[in-house]
From Swiss-Prot:
A motif ('HIGH' region) lies at residues 18-28. GO terms for biological process: methionyl-tRNA aminoacylation. This is Methionine--tRNA ligase. SUPFAM superfamilies: Anticodon-binding domain of a subclass of class I aminoacyl-tRNA synthetases, Methionyl-tRNA synthetase (MetRS), Zn-domain, Nucleic acid-binding proteins, Nucleotidylyl transferase. Homodimer. One of its GO terms (molecular function) is methionine-tRNA ligase activity. It comes from Chromohalobacter salexigens (strain ATCC BAA-138 / DSM 3043 / CIP 106854 / NCIMB 13768 / 1H11). ATP binds at residue 337. Binds 1 zinc ion per subunit. Residues 580-681 form the tRNA-binding domain. Its cofactor is Zn(2+).
Length: 681
């Protein structure tokens, strides 16, 4: 990775694309703050650096959530994009362009790359068997299949791995699998899929992996995958699917992970067209520009295996570096909704200054992939000690004397040139740390300098000298040195705390805090009246933030409930005879129509087809089922229940559903092959 500041570099930087299906939380923010700090540093050094990102807007999950909310996928991704961009702005993440993978630019680039791979013989097709939801009419990804783990017997596990024992398996091995979408039993069906022939690029990838493009830990993991053998990569999904249709393949769509990284190109092209930048000068194979992807270690497979091979096969340049980071833990544990440590960006910003978090992350970030722990007690003490107690303290101790004794103007000469020069020269080592993404090391060096500046002021004790007649100039000289040291520290901290740096720039009455500006002394220079640049972290607000982040039911209680099982809270009823049971006439019905009931917050009006007649039933399932998701679905009803007159009409029976203490409702579905009107016995 280049480190020189003299030669102007052309750099394109990306962060992983957040999925347009949920809110930004502190775990996400680690990556965007890390990237933003690095980009701000590069711009401060005078390089041409562009930072682009986009919402990852395709896939089954987007389609299903939009259906659940009763809006189109386009409306959903537009809404989520606005939320994401507002969150990023709160935390000072300054993209040069923020876009969407659901764009015409991304469609064009996806088709161009796919066509290039296809024409070069790197795409194959073959039939595969998959789980199919007969109710929803779609093929199911592994995460949309749940059942009992075949290894340990734990229930409610996903179709590819068990969260209880860690086992991996195929959906076909899952015991009693069901669709997590409809609850139906999946069917095995065959479909033609398109594959990217990754093994064609084995030699190229061996060289790329060894080329210094990833961290050593990531290289070792890639080599493990490499040595275990490359498989072809399934890049297609069947309709219905929200995404881009594959050229010349009706009903087949690009898998979301194919067009997601291509979204980097699309977002950059959108920026290029707006700003007049030469797109090809960054992406052609012989480009001298640098391209860096910042990602989490959980998506290395896509970015460091498939992505470079795709680019190579399409005749484009590959990334200069793929920089991976670890996960965020809070107080030494996985982020938890019940403990209030699963904290959304918006919730944090309602209680605390986002720059606290930017600094804390920087103070702990290295170039490695270890997880970063946000210890809330340490968070408060470190921010208070470093930013407030050390850095801001320098300016606050000196500014008043400059105002009083120098009429707001610094001394005309520097009383400590060697000290100031040492601070200026320290910038090269700090810059090297920033460049290498060793932010924690850079922050330690900055705080060591802050300690030295405070020690200088404490040793000179201008507040004591100010009481002695005739020493006014000496006091002004000391405090002018202090202000200059503060200015240099803010140059070094500007990438980390840009809002605080902007306030400091206003206070110092200077045009820039760019890296080279540290070399210019402020002499006989007017400064503004000092205002507090940062207040201390209020631990009561931390407590309020975590309380606001909690869910009503604690996670620990849920685990206890799961361990006990539903029978502990809802014991089996008194025994009945067979004759009592035989009185119930249970029938298979098809939900022909489902409607909201005006004035009823809990009810849906269901029109049920019994295969020869229809019934109207009012059911209290509105909270969990959208009407359009129910129509066409088979369920079970009590057909001989006496009609019940309600305020909204007459209910002619009852549909059957299971429920739990948390308010969950699970409508019963018969096995495949059942028909309306059949008796359940």
């Amino acid at each position: 990775m280049p480190t020189t500041a003299n030669a102007k570099r052309k750099i394109l930087v990306t962060s992983a694309l957040p999925y347009a299906n949920g809110s930004i939380h502190l775990g996400h923010l680690l990556e965007y703050i890390q990237t933003d700090i690095w980009v701000r540093f590069q711009k401060s050094r005078g390089h041409e650096c562009h930072y682009v990102c986009a919402d990852d807007a395709h896939g089954t999950a987007i389609m299903l959530r939009a259906e659940q909310e009763g809006i189109t996928p386009e409306q959903l991704i537009s809404k989520v994009s606005a939320e994401h961009q507002a969150d990023f702005a709160r935390f000072g993440v300054a993209f040069d362009n923020y876009y969407s993978t659901h764009s015409e630019e991304n469609r064009q680039h996806s088709e161009r790359i796919y066509t290039a791979l296809r024409d070069a013989g790197h795409i194959s097709t073959r039939d595969i068997e998959q789980m199919y939801d007969p109710v929803k009419g779609l093929f199911l990804a592994d995460r949309f299949i749940k059942g009992t783990c075949p290894k340990c017997g734990a229930g409610d596990q996903y179709g590819d791995n068990c969260e209880a024992c860690g086992a991996t398996y195929t959906p076909a091995e899952l015991i009693d699998p069901v669709s997590a979408i409809s609850g139906a039993t999946p069917e095995v069906r065959s479909s033609t899929h398109f594959f990217f022939k990754l093994p064609d690029f084995a030699d190229f990838m061996q060289g790329w992996i060894d080329g210094g493009h990833v961290q050593p830990q990531i290289r070792n993991k890639l080599l493990e995958w490499f040595e275990s053998g490359f498989n072809e990569w399934d890049i297609s999904r069947d309709a219905p699917y929200f995404g881009f249709e594959i050229p010349d393949a009706p009903g087949k769509y690009f898998y979301v992970w194919l067009d997601a990284p291509i979204g980097y190109l699309a977002s950059f092209q959108n920026l290029c067209e707006r700003e007049g930048i030469d797109f090809d000068s960054y992406w052609r194979r012989d480009s001298d520009a640098e391209v860096y992807h910042f990602i989490g270690k959980d998506i290395v497979y896509f970015h460091a295996l498939f992505w470079p091979a795709m680019l190579e096969g399409a005749g484009l340049r590959t990334p200069t570096g793929v920089n991976c980071h670890g996960f965020v833990t809070v107080n030494g544990a996985k982020m938890s909704k019940s403990r209030g440590t699963f904290i959304k960006a918006q919730t944090y910003a309602e209680y605390l200054n986002p720059e606290y978090l930017r600094y804390y992350f920087a103070a702990k970030l290295t170039a490695g992939v270890d997880d970063l722990d946000l210890n809330l007690e340490d968070f408060a003490s470190r921010v208070n000690a470093d930013l407030v107690g050390k850095v801001v303290n320098i300016a606050s101790r000196c500014a008043g004397f400059v105002k009083k004794l120098g009429a707001g103007r610094l001394a005309a000469h520097c009383a400590e040139p060697e000290l100031v020069t040492r601070f200026v020269e320290a910038g090269e080592a700090i810059a090297a740390d920033y460049e290498a993404r060793e932010f924690a090391r850079a922050m330690r060096k900055v705080m060591d300098l802050a300690d030295e500046a405070n020690a200088y002021i404490a040793d000179k004790a201008p507040w004591v000298l100010a009481k002695e007649e005739g020493r006014e100039q000496e006091v002004l000289d000391i405090c002018s040195v202090g202000i200059n040291l503060f200015r240099i520290l803010m140059v070094y901290l500007q990438p980390v705390v840009p809002a605080m740096a902007e306030q400091a720039r206003d206070f110092l009455q200077i045009e820039s805090l760019d890296w080279e500006s540290r070399r210019t002394l402020l002499e006989d220079h007017a400064i503004a009246k000092f205002k507090p640049l940062m207040t201390r972290v209020d631990t009561d607000k931390i407590a309020s933030m975590t309380e606001a982040s909690k869910e009503v039911l604690a996670e620990e209680q849920k685990l206890k409930e799961q361990a006990k099982g539903p029978l502990a809270d809802d014991p089996i009823a008194d025994e009945i005879g067979f004759d009592d049971f035989a009185k119930l006439d249970l029938r298979i019905v098809r939900i022909a129509k489902a409607e909201y009931v005006e004035g009823a917050k809990k009810l849906l009006k269901l029109t049920l087809d019994l295969g020869g007649e229809t019934r109207t039933v009012f059911s209290g399932i509105r909270a969990v089922y959208a009407p359009e998701a129910l129509e066409g679905r088979l369920t079970v009803m009590v057909a001989n229940l006496a009609p019940r007159k309600m305020r909204f009409g007459v209910s002619e029976g009852m549909v059957l559903a299971a429920g739990d203490k948390e308010g969950g409702i699970y409508l019963l579905s018969p096995d495949n092959g059942a028909e309306p009107g059949q008796r359940v016995s």
